[in-house]
């Protein structure tokens, strides 16, 4: 598999796993960090550096997977911002 395809697959896997984080703040932070990291490293052309970044990404993927499991073991109430129901001023 080409390096580009591997990077895209890793990016998608990281985003998918981070969306599973139960805590809103951690979830949004993880998504933002993943996007920022991939944008920052987009211009890298050195294959050794690409390999280092890919390995770091794989380690981060495993870390996120562990955090998802831990987060589901110790769940907390959802934040108000996470509720799907829109509140109306007429609702009392």
Swiss-Prot record:
Keyword Coiled coil carried by entry: yes
Organism: Drosophila subobscura
Protein name according to UniProt: LYR motif-containing protein 4 homolog
Function, as annotated: Stabilizing factor of the core iron-sulfur cluster (ISC) assembly complex that regulates the stability and cysteine desulfurase activity of Nfs1 and participates in the [2Fe-2S] clusters assembly on the scaffolding protein IscU.
Subcellular location: Mitochondrion
Disulfide bonds: none
GO cellular component, one term: L-cysteine desulfurase complex
Principal location: mitochondrion
Complex and partners: Component of the mitochondrial core iron-sulfur cluster (ISC) assembly complex at least composed of the cysteine desulfurase Nfs1, the scaffold protein IscU, the accessory protein bcn92/Isd11/Lyrm4, and probably fh/frataxin. Interacts with Nfs1.
Family of this protein: Belongs to the complex I LYR family.
Keyword terms of this UniProt record: Coiled coil, Mitochondrion
Protein's gene: bcn92
Chain segments annotated as coiled-coil in the UniProt record: 40-68
GO biological process: iron-sulfur cluster assembly
């Amino acid at each position: 598999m080409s390096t580009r395809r591997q990077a895209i697959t890793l990016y998608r896997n990281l985003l998918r796993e981070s969306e599973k984080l139960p805590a809103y703040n951690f979830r949004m932070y993880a998504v933002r960090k993943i996007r920022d990291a991939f944008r920052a490293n987009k211009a890298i052309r050195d294959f050794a550096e690409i390999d280092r970044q890919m390995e770091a990404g794989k380690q981060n993927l495993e870390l996120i997977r562990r955090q998802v499991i831990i987060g589901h073991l110790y769940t907390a109430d959802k934040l108000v911002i996470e509720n799907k129901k829109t509140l109306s001023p007429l609702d009392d």
